[in-house]
Amino acid sequence: LKSQTLRKSGLLGLHRGEERFDQLGGLDNLKAFCRRALARSNTKSKHRPRGVLLLSPPGCGKSQFAKSLGNETGRPTLTLDIGSLMGSLVGQSEQNIRHALQIADAMAPAILFCDEIEKGLAGAGGSGQSDSGVTARVFGNLLTWLNDHTSDVFVVATCNDISRLPPEFSRAERFDGVFFVDLPTREQRDAIWQIYISEFDLDAEQERPDDEHWTGAEIRACSRLSALLDVPLAQAATNIVPVASTSAESVNELRTWASGRCLSADEPGIFKSRTTGRRRRRRAVHGNPLNN
């Protein structure tokens, strides 16, 4: 009956993949946090977990984590695309978001996955002149539900651009934690290579390309192209352009913003940027102008 209601509504998707945590390198703290939180989901409603907001550059495993979490915990993973709920008739968008969230409540216990949520909520904090305030009202309905719902629905929302997300969305008590997923470390990249070399049946002894600043998605793409084109990994890597190169400024800005504001997805505690703390060397100024 629940699945039938879901199909008829057309407002939510149902992910049917077979992803697991052991197919996802890194994110140890995030995995442990969510496992522990969901282990308490059968307690009183006031103790039930709310969810997590994941912030990172594209390709770092946020979406794969959300899909894996449902399989790890035995819950269906519902997908909510806020942009697709926008209707042309007056009041239709607001009705759609309310109905979608009611269905999510009815599907409990469940995971509700909102991918790249900033795209659906872009403009929610503006004047509302562009869409007569529709986005702001949809956003208001979502905030109310995040605050007040008592159903056993665990929200996993992902975001690539925090500047486009209204600040009140990420405040305390909307989510159990706001996590930053950084580019993988050397150790994590090695683990990711092992996963995809095995998945695509590649030679594990071959030389690997220079993968400094690569994301997990780029490692997977290189492995897939190596298998597809029947070429070594080093040759397949010539077709990969890392997001850290194409969007270096935005990646650094995102990492700087998250430092001290977000939890680390990799280890317990607050995220601290590996690049934060560099200071531009100041030119010495002498009392005698001739020496300056």
Segments predicted by a language model, with ranges:
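C-terminal engagement/docking regions of AAA+ P-loop ATPases
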Residues: 4-68, 72, 102, 106, ...
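Alpha-helix capping and helix-coil boundary motifs
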Residues: 89, 230-233
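Walker A/P-loop NTP-binding motif of AAA+ ATPase domains
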Residues: 21-210, 292
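Conserved P-loop NTPase
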Residues: 214, 218, 224-228
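Phosphate/oxyanion-binding loops and surfaces in catalytic or ligand/nucleic-acid-binding neighborhoods
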Residues: 199, 229, 243
